[in-house]
């Protein structure tokens, strides 16, 4: 049986059905087609304001263009379809914008896109979109960091099994694990802020020489190009570019790299949560929300869906970022294909990373930590989790090789017999000759073998009693 979509549903190109990590999140709207169109309008109006500031476009014309240029006056779907004829959306956009301005002021319409080129407008618009998405992302990262600091402080000395290559290794604390997550989130936050501060305008004209701008300005002076770039940067709030970057794609590659790191940082948290939430581990659980995590087949399940969503994004973003790095191989002064290949992967980087950050806020602010289960799991190996400690104490007494061999044999025997390491060691003359029962019991207490974990937590969060300042989302 064939199902027919209604015209309304058919018109919805991408609602996030297959990308739930970002569906309905704030960043989704910030990087939508409508947001890009609004940024293109802003790029064009900022350009004409900059030209008017330098006296090369009449103030009245600039004012008329700014007044008439409204995204809602443009047909987004028509522009998208028209872009198939020109391989970029700006050509049709400029034509439509000129018509809108001409309907209000025909003389002013002559100054729309004056001396410019498609890539100047779309690249600048892209930087505006990246900046706005970044504000949302940094706000979410700040909330993640605050939640992680609370977890690290609360569980500074909460003992749990440290696991290496999936197996119990030595004891650690959940606070140290949370502090490690905090370190990654803080670094991601720093990188997004540094990226935002460096986002540049694009102004190069047809082939990177700004010749069209200069010609239309009618020989205004040798420093006009520099002054125009500065004025354009002022009008947009972006950074002035040292050179046109039509084929020098550092800002785009940097955006992809920051998104990839951010997604990976959150992905590390997600995979840890998934591992700790396993039925047989049960040390953490995601926030309990009615209906969330339900299985279509198994009524008993409450799946860790938030961690799953974040992990899905973390697995995708690096691949999209790789496309952006590949697009740096842009030939000549303007590329046919490399530039065009960036647009959708860049959007995916932003909305997946932004969706992951927004999802991580809910995960981390509502994460439940089961300290009792953590303590119980420390005893699963019957004391073997502190075999390193016992070997270290016996080494000066027996020698390194003999102490290690003894603990290896004892651990295997305890596992084979299904008994504790303490029982095996208490029957070993090499041990009882040097250690009393009380001393052995103390050595095998996993809560007394946390190393520097609590102090490392203090270092990460600025001390046991000092709050860590979190930067604003600006």
Curated annotation (Swiss-Prot):
Top-level EC class as recorded in UniProt: lyase
Keyword terms of this UniProt record: Lyase
Enzyme Commission identifier(s): 4.3.99.5
Chain residues that bind fumarate: 301, 303
Active-site residues (renumbered): 295, 334
Known catalytic reactions: 2-nitrobutanedioate = fumarate + nitrite + H(+)
InterPro entries (alphabetical): AdenyloSucc_lyase_C (IPR019468), Fumarase/histidase_N (IPR024083), Fumarate_lyase_fam (IPR000362), Fumarate_lyase_N (IPR022761), L-Aspartase-like (IPR008948)
Molecular functions per Gene Ontology: lyase activity
Superkingdom of origin organism: Bacteria
A UniProt-annotated Pfam family: Lyase_1
Keyword hit for Lyase: yes
Similarity section: Belongs to the class-II fumarase/aspartase family.
Role: Involved in the biosynthesis of desferrioxamine derivatives which have iron-binding properties and may act as siderophores. Catalyzes the formation of nitrous acid from nitrosuccinic acid (2-nitrobutanedioate) by elimination of its nitro group.
PANTHER family listed in its UniProt record: ADENYLOSUCCINATE LYASE, ADENYLOSUCCINATE LYASE C-TERMINAL DOMAIN-CONTAINING PROTEIN
Protein name per its UniProtKB record: Nitrosuccinate lyase
Protein source organism: Streptomyces davaonensis (strain DSM 101723 / JCM 4913 / KCC S-0913 / 768)
């Amino acid at each position: 049986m064939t199902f027919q979509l209604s015209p309304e549903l058919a018109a919805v190109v991408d609602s996030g059905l297959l990308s739930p990590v970002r569906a309905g999140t704030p960043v989704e709207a910030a990087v939508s087609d409508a947001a890009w169109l609004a940024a293109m309008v802003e790029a064009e109006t900022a350009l004409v304001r900059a030209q008017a500031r330098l006296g090369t476009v009449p103030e009245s014309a600039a004012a008329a263009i700014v007044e008439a240029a409204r995204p809602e006056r443009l047909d987004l779907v028509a522009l998208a379809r028209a872009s198939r004829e020109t391989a970029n959306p700006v050509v049709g956009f400029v034509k439509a914008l000129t018509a809108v301005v001409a309907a209000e002021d025909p003389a002013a319409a002559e100054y729309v896109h004056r001396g410019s080129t498609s890539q100047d407008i779309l690249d600048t618009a892209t930087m505006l979109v990246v900046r706005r998405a970044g504000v949302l992302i940094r706000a979410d990262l700040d909330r993640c960091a605050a939640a992680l600091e609370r977890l690290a402080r609360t569980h500074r000395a909460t003992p749990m099994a440290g696991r290496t290559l999936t197996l119990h290794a030595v004891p650690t604390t959940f606070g140290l694990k949370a502090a490690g997550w905090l370190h990654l989130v803080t670094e991601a936050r720093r990188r997004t802020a540094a990226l935002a501060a460096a986002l540049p305008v694009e102004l190069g004209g047809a082939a990177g020489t700004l010749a069209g701008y200069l010609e239309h300005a009618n020989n205004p002076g040798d420093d006009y190009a520099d002054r125009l770039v500065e004025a354009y940067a002022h009008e947009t709030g972006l950074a002035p570019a040292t050179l046109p970057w039509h084929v020098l794609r550092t800002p785009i590659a940097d955006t992809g790299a920051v998104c990839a790191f951010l997604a990976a940082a959150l992905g590390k948290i997600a995979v840890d949560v998934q591992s700790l939430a396993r039925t047989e581990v049960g040390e953490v659980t995601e926030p309990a929300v009615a209906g969330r995590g339900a299985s279509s087949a198994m009524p008993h399940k409450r799946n860790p869906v938030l961690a799953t969503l974040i992990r899905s994004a973390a697995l995708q973003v690096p691949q999209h970022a790789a496309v952006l790095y590949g697009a740096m191989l842009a030939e000549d002064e303007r590329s046919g294909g490399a530039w065009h290949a960036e647009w959708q992967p860049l959007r995916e980087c932003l909305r997946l990373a932004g969706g992951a950050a927004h999802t991580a806020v809910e995960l981390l602010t509502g994460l439940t930590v089961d300290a009792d289960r953590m303590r119980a799991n420390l005893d699963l190996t019957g004391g073997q989790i502190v075999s390193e400690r016992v070997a270290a104490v016996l080494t000066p007494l027996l020698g390194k090789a003999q102490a290690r061999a003894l603990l290896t044999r004892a651990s295997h025997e305890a596992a084979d017999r299904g008994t504790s390491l303490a029982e095996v060691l208490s029957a070993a003359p090499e041990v009882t000759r040097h250690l009393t029962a009380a001393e052995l019991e103390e050595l095998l207490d996993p809560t007394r073998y946390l190393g520097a974990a609590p102090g490392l937590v203090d270092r990460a969060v600025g001390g046991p009693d000092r709050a860590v300042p979190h930067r604003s989302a600006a």
